[in-house]
A protein has these predicted regions:
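Conserved catalytic core of sirtuin-type NAD+-dependent deacylases
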Residues: 1-250
Length: 250
C-alpha cells in the first residue's frame, strides 16, 4: 500500500476519532531547522553530553554553562526558528476539538507557539529558567544570558534552564499527564521519534493497550513500526499532516 492510500486511511481514522493525542520527537523540530541531539548531524557529535549532567553543572558550572548557552541560546537567537506546518496542524486539530493534547520530547516550545494549549513537556522547556534552590521560574527572554549563569532574583540561587539534565527525573505533572492522555485517547499519532529514549518511549504502548489506533509519521521505521503501529507513513510530518488534514471530514 502506498503513502497516498495510507494517508486516506489515516484521515478516515482521525475523522472518526473523539480524542486524538500527538506524540512528537526530534524529527518534528528538525523540520523547523533544529538539529537532533542524536544520530547523524546530532548535537552530541559536536559537544560532550556530560556537559548536561546535573552533577557536572553543579561542580563545573561555568564550563557547563558555556556549552549550554552556545548550544541552546546563541544558536536559537541567530536562527529564524518557528513552527512548521506539522505543528500548525496539531494546533488546528485542538481548536477543532479533535486533539486533546500533545506529548512532546522536545524542549523548544514550538507547540505552544503554534497554538496548542495542552502540551505535556516530557523533557521540560528551554524557554524558562528555574532556580535550583527555591524553584522560582522565569521566562528566559527576561534574563541577560552572559558568561555566568543567571542567579535567582528571589533568593540569589543558581538558575538552570527548565529542561531535564542527565541525572534528573521526568517532571511528575508531565509524566502522569502523558500517561492519562495515552490511556484516554482513541487515536495516537507518533511523529518524528525513533522510540529509543526512555521512559518517554513507553507512552505509545499505553495508548495501544487501551485500544487507540496508532498512526506513525517518520522518515524511517522506528521501534514502534512493526509492533504497535497501525498505519505507518514515511516522510516529513510537515507534508503528511496537512495532506491528512485536507482529507478529513468536517
Amino acid at each position: 500500500m502506498n503513502n497516498e492510500e495510507k494517508i486516506k486511511q489515516a484521515a478516515e481514522i482521525l475523522s472518526k476519532a473523539k480524542n486524538i493525542v500527538g506524540f512528537t520527537g526530534a524529527g518534528t523540530s528538525a523540520e523547523s531547522g533544529i538539529p537532533p541531539f542524536r544520530g547523524e548531524g546530532g548535537i552530541w557529535n559536536q559537544y560532550d553530553p556530560n556537559s548536561l549532567d546535573i552533577d557536572f553543572y553543579y561542580r563545573h558550572t561555568k564550563e557547563s554553562w558555556k556549552i549550554i548557552r552556545e548550544v541552546f541560546y546563541n544558536f536559537f537567537s541567530n536562527k529564524d526558528i518557528k513552527p512548521n506546518p506539522g505543528h500548525l496542524i496539531l494546533a488546528k486539530w485542538e481548536k477543532e476539538g479533535r486533539l486533546s493534547s500533545v506529548i512532546t520530547q522536545n524542549i523548544d516550545d514550538l507547540h505552544t507557539v503554534a497554538g496548542n494549549s495542552v502540551v505535556y513537556e516530557f523533557h521540560g522547556n528551554m524557554s524558562r529558567f528555574v532556580c535550583t534552590k527555591c524553584g522560582h521560574k522565569v521566562d528566559a527572554k527576561s534574563l541577560t544570558l552572559s558568561e555566568e549563569p543567571p542567579r535567582c532574583a528571589q533568593c540569589g540561587g543558581l538558575m538552570k534552564p527548565d529542561f531535564i539534565f542527565f541525572g534528573e527525573g521526568i517532571p511528575e505533572d508531565a509524566y502522569y499527564g502523558s500517561v492519562r492522555a495515552a490511556e484516554n485517547c482513541d487515536a495516537f499519532v507518533i511523529i518524528g521519534t525513533s522510540g529509543q529514549v526512555s521512559p518517554a518511549n513507553m507512552i505509545p504502548g499505553i495508548a495501544k493497550r487501551n485500544g487507540a489506533k496508532i498512526i506513525e509519521i517518520n522518515m524511517e521505521p522506528s521501534t514502534y513500526t512493526n509492533y504497535i503501529t497501525d498505519i505507518y507513513l514515511e516522510g516529513k510530518s510537515g507534508e503528511i499532516l496537512p495532506a491528512i488534514d485536507a482529507l478529513m471530514t468536517r
